[in-house]
Amino acid sequence: MEQKILVVDDARFARKVAIKSLNNGGFDNIVQATTAAEAKEVFLNENPDLVLLDITLPDNSDLTLLEWMISVRPDAKIIMTSAIAQDLIIEDSIKAGAKAFIAKPFMEKAFLEKIFEVLEAEDKQ
């Protein structure tokens, strides 16, 4: 598929799983980042159609990076990911501008359904 997806996660295994799932869903234009600083650079230079953003990074452990991305591109399609799926974290992520939240570990089918849902919902607006 043509859409470019940025996967931001400091855990190598989590990135590999997400990328494999995205490839299985037909996405092959994928860029990666492992820190907030790297994610900012890639976000600005690559202009991704969708961002999968882990909430906890070595240099960012809250919603600061999400808020920065939304301030730079208010129309950004960002899905937060985390192994900590507490209601408050999910609510705060959505309030800050995330389009969805995916708890890790995830099942590939549900993961891809959420990806397509966010991409399609945004395209209809």
Name each region found by the language model.
Residues 88, 106-115:
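C-terminal output helix
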Residues 32-50:
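Acidic, metal-coordinating helix/loop segments flanking the phosphotransfer/catalytic sites
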Residues 41, 63-75:
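Short amphipathic alpha-helix used as the core "switch/output" element in two-component signaling
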Residues 12-31:
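Two-component/phosphorelay signaling modules centered on CheY-like receiver
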Residues 58, 86:
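The feature encodes the CheY-like receiver
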Residues 35, 61-64:
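Acidic catalytic/metal-coordinating carboxylates
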